[in-house]
Swiss-Prot record:
Similarity comment text for this entry: Belongs to the protein-tyrosine phosphatase family.
Topology of this chain in the membrane: Lipid-anchor
InterPro entries: CDKN3, Prot-tyrosine_phosphatase-like, PTP, Tyr_Pase_cat, Tyr_Pase_dom, TYR_PHOSPHATASE_DUAL_dom
SUPFAM superfamilies for this protein: (Phosphotyrosine protein) phosphatases II
Domain (Tyrosine-protein phosphatase): residue spans on this chain: 10-164
Taxonomic source organism: Dictyostelium discoideum (Social amoeba)
One Pfam match: CDKN3
Residues the entry annotates as binding substrate: R113
Catalyses which reaction(s): O-phospho-L-tyrosyl-[protein] + H2O = L-tyrosyl-[protein] + phosphate
GO MF term set: protein tyrosine phosphatase activity
Protein name as annotated: Probable protein tyrosine phosphatase type IVA A
Key words of the record: Disulfide bond, Hydrolase, Lipoprotein, Membrane, Methylation, Prenylation, Protein phosphatase
Amino acid sequence: MTGIRSALPNPASLVESSTHRFLIFDAPNDDNLPLYINELKKYNVSHLVRACDPTYSTEPLQAIGIQVHDMPFADGGSPPDAVVNNWIKILGESYKKDSKETIGIHCVAGLGRAPVLVAIALIEGGMNPLQAVEYIRERRRGSINIKQIQYLKNYKSKKKSSCRIM
C-alpha cells in the first residue's frame, strides 16, 4: 500500500517496477464509479484493463482520457495467449521512461486475474516468477492462487531477447 489515502471500500494496491506502475483494485459499478475515478486520477491512470466482465460504463473514463481495454478470462484461472499478447502490447504502448503514468487493472475482487497480469509484466521485465508473486502479495494480501502460481512458474517471457535488466 502507499501513503495515499483511499476512499474506496476496498483500497487499491500500487505495484511499481522499473518500467511501469500498476494500480490493482476490485471492480467498480456504475453507482460507485465516481469514487474509482477519483482514485484513478490520484494515481495518474492512463490505461485501464478489465480482466472480468463489464460492470460499468466506460464513457466517464474515456471522457477523462483513460483508455479502457477489455481482457476478460476465467475467474481463478490463467490468461489465454490472446489476453497475454494484448497485455504485452499495452505494456509496450504505455512505457515511457521516467513516466508517472499508471496502468489501472481490475478483476472482480482484485485478487486473482488482475495480479496475475501484473506478475506477467514483472516477469517480462526480468523478475523471477516467484519473486513477482511475493512482491505483489506484499502489496495485495491474498492475491494469486496456487493454480495461478503454477502457471506463472511455467510462464515463458514473450520477449525476443533473453538478456534482460530489471
